[in-house]
Amino acid sequence: MANYEFSQVSEDRPGCRLTRKAQIGLGVGLLLLVALVVVVVIVLWPRSPLVWKGKPTTKHFADIILGRCLIYTQILRPEMRDQDCKKILSTFKRGFISKNPCNITNEDYAPLVKLVTQTIPCNKTLFWSKSKHLAHQYTWIQGKMFTLEDTLLGYIADDLRWCGDPSTSDMNYDSCPHWSENCPNNPVAVFWNVISQKFAEDACGVVQVMLNGSLSEPFYRNSTFGSVEVFNLDPNKVHKLQAWVMHDIKGTSSNACSSPSINELKSIVNKRNMIFACQDNYRPVRFLQCVKNPEHPSCRLNV
């Protein structure tokens, strides 16, 4: 048998081993790959929606919005039949979907306001504060005046709740922010402030506001009318604001037009170069109250 001598391969000999520089590069590459995988998992991993104390989005929200829009444009106001209700719905939803419901801005609803164009005739605008039901009864019977909820955007959203969540492209049907949660920039509040501002800016001629005279402060500075609408009336288009201070027909009657609260409203209006007028228990509206209380002394006609 031939004699063969086997020698040990020197560890210092270059072979298949990686250089130290290559080892470092490979290690860095692996770390980056692991980091990328972690990021992808975090992004794609389903997260639980934020939990709030308030009631959730109204069930069948999209169906209600679309249905109301069609009723309004095809039946109630056929002159607006050219409005695209499906586009209005999708634009509305984009204002709050996939967003933190406490970080909604006026700009989020700007495309919706721009999309829906509606002209309210001069002298036909009626604002209200703490008198919603009575104001709506009046415009429904009177037929020619408009509250905010008699406009298309106000009509489709009236009495609904909605919010989204940054973790999903759907609406939050579990909970939405409650007014007590220090979340003033929520989807509902911002929406009404935005369209209230537009409603006031578009008003012209003589405008009316229906106030609740049964309250200690018929004019409330923190209400939508007191904080948004009255300050967005354009004095170049509106020359007079008439306040109708309505009292509960079964309550104590008082001269609310001379109260400090109404005088504050008068001061605001006058400083903005508009005329102010006030009337307690505006008679046409009083008649509506009398329908349910026909025997009340204030409802009896002197024949």
From Swiss-Prot:
What controls how active this protein is? Both NAADP and cADPR synthesis are inhibited by nicotinic acid.
Q: Which residues lie on this side of the membrane: Extracellular?
A: 45-303
Tissue specificity is: Spleen, liver, heart, thymus, thyroid gland, ileum, colon, cerebellum, salivary gland, adrenal gland, jejunum, islets of Langerhans and osteoclasts.
**What EC identifiers does the entry list?**
3.2.2.-, 3.2.2.6, 2.4.99.20
Q: Which UniProt keywords apply?
A: Cell membrane, Disulfide bond, Glycoprotein, Hydrolase, Membrane, NAD, NADP, Signal-anchor, Transferase, Transmembrane, Transmembrane helix
Looking up PANTHER family in the UniProt record yields:
ADP-RIBOSYL CYCLASE, ADP-RIBOSYL CYCLASE_CYCLIC ADP-RIBOSE HYDROLASE 1
Q: Name one GO biological process term.
A: negative regulation of neuron projection development
Which parts of the chain does the record assign to the membrane side Cytoplasmic?
Answer: 1-21
By sequence similarity, the record places it as follows: Belongs to the ADP-ribosyl cyclase family.
Q: Disulfide pairs?
A: 69-85, 102-183, 163-176, 257-278, 290-299
Q: In UniProt terms, what function does this protein have?
A: Synthesizes the second messengers cyclic ADP-ribose and nicotinate-adenine dinucleotide phosphate, the former a second messenger for glucose-induced insulin secretion, the latter a Ca(2+) mobilizer. Also has cADPR hydrolase activity. Regulates osteoclastic bone resorption, probably via production of cyclic ADP-ribose and triggering of a cytosolic calcium ion signal through ryanodine receptor activation.
Q: How does it sit in the membrane?
A: Single-pass type II membrane protein
Reactions catalysed, as given in the entry: NAD(+) = cyclic ADP-beta-D-ribose + nicotinamide + H(+); nicotinate + NADP(+) = nicotinate-adenine dinucleotide phosphate + nicotinamide; NAD(+) + H2O = ADP-D-ribose + nicotinamide + H(+)
This protein's name: ADP-ribosyl cyclase/cyclic ADP-ribose hydrolase 1
